Amino acid sequence: MKNIVLTGFMATGKTTVGKKVATNMSFGFIDTDKMIEKMANMTVSDIFEKYGEDYFRRLEKAAVIKAARLKNFVIATGGGVVLNPSNIVQLRKNGVVICFVARPEIILRNIGKNKDRPLLMVDNPEEKIRQLLKEREPFYRFADYTIDVSDMTIDEVAEEVIKAYIRLKKG
C-alpha cells in the first residue's frame, strides 16, 4: 500500500499524529528529521548552528529519497521539506501527501518554550512564523489533501488523515 506522507509547518502535529495513524493503520512510522539527526549524529538545531540551512537541506533530500522507498509507512516530514520540489516528487511516487496547516498563534502555542526550532530563534517568533507561512504557502498547495488542524484534537486529525488516505489511495 502507498505511504501516508505528512507535510506542513513545524509544530502542526505531524509526528504526534503520524505515530497515532501508523498504529491505527498497522503501518511503520518514520520521521525525516530523526533520520537526519541519525545521519549527522547531531540534533537538527546543532546541524543548523554548525553547518547552516543549506547543509541541512542536502541531508533532508537524502533522507527523503530513503524514506520514499519504504512501503506501508507513515512518513512525518520536516516543516521545510516542501521547499525542494524534488522532495515532493519523490514522496508522491509511492505516497499520498497530506499537509497540515494551522493559524500562526496556534503554531506559536504548540512550540511553547521549545528551543529546538532554529528558524524561530528571533526576537519576534510569531512574525517569523507569519513570514515563513507566507513563503511556503505556494509549496503546500502540492499536497493531495490539506487539513487545518488549528481547532482539532490529535484524535480528530488522525481520523481525518485516515479518511483522506482511504479516499485518495483509490485515485
From Swiss-Prot:
InterPro entries: P-loop_NTPase, Shikimate/glucono_kinase, Shikimate_kinase/TSH1, Shikimate_kinase_CS. Binds 1 Mg(2+) ion per subunit. Substrate binds at residues 33, 57, 79, 136. Pathway: Metabolic intermediate biosynthesis; chorismate biosynthesis; chorismate from D-erythrose 4-phosphate and phosphoenolpyruvate: step 5/7. It comes from the Bacteria. One of its GO terms (molecular function) is shikimate kinase activity. Belongs to the shikimate kinase family. Monomer. This is Shikimate kinase.
